[in-house]
């Protein structure tokens, strides 16, 4: 019996080492108030890694309303009964504190804002499906913002001029307005107004003689590439590549303005029929305002 009592049990062996066991975490308090935490873990390769972290604790004191502090200590009730103290992230969102100060006539202001918002919304719905079209180059932008408004005539003006001059009957009718009476006749309806306006239309003759229209352009083309193609023949002052407003891809045509007409003529001769991005370019002079 004495021999059995002195025999050590294998379960009481404290020196048994498990190769997969990790050493316990060690926390050391430093003199400066920080804590050094040493822990161990296994990395992705299965090797034991030692991790040392130094933690500094900072106490932030906040002065709040005593009633607010008291409400925070209340026990939760209702659907939140039994939950931990503090806001729950699934039911509470913490945001900026906004101070609401209603004015005296806030009802009238709210009614006016609602009315204005309804009118804007209706106008927006009406113009939602409408697209802006330039009258000069047929691009999807306002005519006033067209880069070629000073070099090309609008489409309606060019087509109207091609139809011929107004007849004598129209001139007589326009000139006869207000004859013998004191009624007012608008300047554009007076006799000779059309011819005078045509003589004054010098803005369309500024540099339209040196502007080329390029068609059959790839939808993947870029303005810089087109400029590089045509700058070989002379100084290019402006390049406009029409793009789709939604997809931002080229619409198939572009305008190139040269500083000298001779350079534009040479570029038109060389680049007409030129292969670019698997397409054959069609180059011609832009229609001049008549």
UniProtKB/Swiss-Prot annotation:
GO terms for molecular function: RNA binding; translation initiation factor activity. The keyword Cytoplasm applies. GO terms for biological process: formation of cytoplasmic translation initiation complex; translation reinitiation; translational termination. GO terms for cellular component: eukaryotic 43S preinitiation complex; eukaryotic 48S preinitiation complex; eukaryotic translation initiation factor 3 complex, eIF3e; eukaryotic translation initiation factor 3 complex, eIF3m; multi-eIF complex. Residues 1-35, 157-200 are annotated as: Disordered. InterPro entries: eIF3_g, eIF3g_N, eIF3G_RRM, Nucleotide-bd_a/b_plait_sf, RBD_domain_sf, RRM_dom. Keywords: Cytoplasm, Initiation factor, Protein biosynthesis, RNA-binding. It is found in: Cytoplasm. Residues 210-288 form the RRM domain. SUPFAM superfamilies: RNA-binding domain, RBD. The keyword Protein biosynthesis applies. Belongs to the eIF-3 subunit G family. Component of the eukaryotic translation initiation factor 3 (eIF-3) complex. RNA-binding component of the eukaryotic translation initiation factor 3 (eIF-3) complex, which is involved in protein synthesis of a specialized repertoire of mRNAs and, together with other initiation factors, stimulates binding of mRNA and methionyl-tRNAi to the 40S ribosome. The eIF-3 complex specifically targets and initiates translation of a subset of mRNAs involved in cell proliferation. This subunit can bind 18S rRNA. PANTHER family: EUKARYOTIC TRANSLATION INITIATION FACTOR 3 SUBUNIT G. This is Eukaryotic translation initiation factor 3 subunit G. The lineage of its organism: Eukaryota, Fungi, Dikarya, Ascomycota, Pezizomycotina. The gene is tif35.
